[in-house]
Amino acid sequence: MEGDLSGFNIDAPRWDQCTFLGRVKHFFNITDPRTVFASEQELDWAKAVVEKSRMGLVPPGTQMEQLLYAKKLYDSAFHPDTGEKMNVIGRMSFQVPGGMLITGFMLQFYRTMPAVIFWQWVNQSFNALVNYTNRNAASPTSVRQMALSYFTATTTAVATAVGMNMWTKRAPPLVGRWVPFAAVAAANCVNIPMMRQQELIQGICVKDRNQNELGHSQRAAAVGIAQVVISRITMAAPGMILLPVIMERLERLHLMKKVKVMHAPLQVLLCGCFLLFMVPVACGLFPQECELSVSYLEPELRDTIKAKYGEQVLFVYFNKGL
């Protein structure tokens, strides 16, 4: 489809972000694992196209499909706050290939203590990078904070896994298979708030509908971080809860007993199937651009906004991160 696209608003969402289904479609688009394989030249091209489109300088003959593809690549690889290119492993589009490998091996190698400790460490290293990459970039994070967050989350995950492994020794085998999920959930409750503690201490930047900065709110930061924690646990839950049940049944089959070497690859593949759908679903649970009533903000910030804008500003907006 060709035509004059100079007035096309490339930043306008293709799907309604006020609805869950619209957000899921949006994240299906930008978390597409295939975008991980886009070359640096393609990503630079996408950024150039998006920036030119924002200025109304779309080259004549450009097709709508090209603009939409450029925006897809841009959203998958560049940070929404800074516009900087994100590292490949930390992108949400890498959640499927990266997550399926780590989750599959966590679920497969859960019996021995060294394996539990190693794979929980690998998982928390991956999570720490993802959390940092997808943070709200308006709130800087120091190296000390990142190191403390990483150490605390890894310790929490390993302690939970080791403790529950010891506790479930006499429990049915299926219960032991759920230990990795308990460790992941516990670590997410620590890792994300710790990685973004600066937002909880100093507040997150909140804006009005026209993107004018209004101040910093700790309450808004707490809401955004809580939503991210819920999303991350939701992302992992179906695969890490249902897959052990599936594998428990499959491993009883005569064929599976003969090809034990295929158990790990099968778990990795099935994890990928779960994550392919759960990454966009979990990311779409809450709007990325959060809306919060002014009445919920801290009294000082609320009074400042009302004194300056009166009743014109009833809601504030902020990027909660992913």
UniProtKB/Swiss-Prot annotation:
GO molecular function: monoatomic ion transmembrane transporter activity
Modified residues (N-acetylmethionine): M1
GO cellular component terms attached to this protein's record: mitochondrial inner membrane; mitochondrial outer membrane; mitochondrion
Alphabetized UniProt keyword annotations: Acetylation, Amino-acid transport, Membrane, Mitochondrion, Mitochondrion inner membrane, Mitochondrion outer membrane, Transmembrane, Transmembrane helix, Transport
GO biological process, one term: mitochondrial transmembrane transport
Localization: Mitochondrion inner membrane; Mitochondrion outer membrane
Transmembrane feature ranges: 99-119, 147-167, 174-194, 223-243, 266-286
Topology relative to the membrane: Multi-pass membrane protein
Record's keyword annotation contains Acetylation: yes
Pfam families: SFXNs
Tissue: Expressed in brain, heart, kidney, spleen, thymus, liver, stomach and skin.
Location, primary (coarse class): mitochondrion
Keyword Transmembrane helix among UniProt keywords: yes
Catalytic activity: L-serine(in) = L-serine(out)
Top-level lineage group: Eukaryota
Protein family per UniProt: Belongs to the sideroflexin family.
Function: Mitochondrial amino-acid transporter that mediates transport of serine into mitochondria. Involved in mitochondrial iron homeostasis by regulating heme biosynthesis.
Record-given protein name: Sideroflexin-2
Species of provenance: Mus musculus (Mouse)
Lineage of the organism: Eukaryota, Metazoa, Chordata, Craniata, Vertebrata
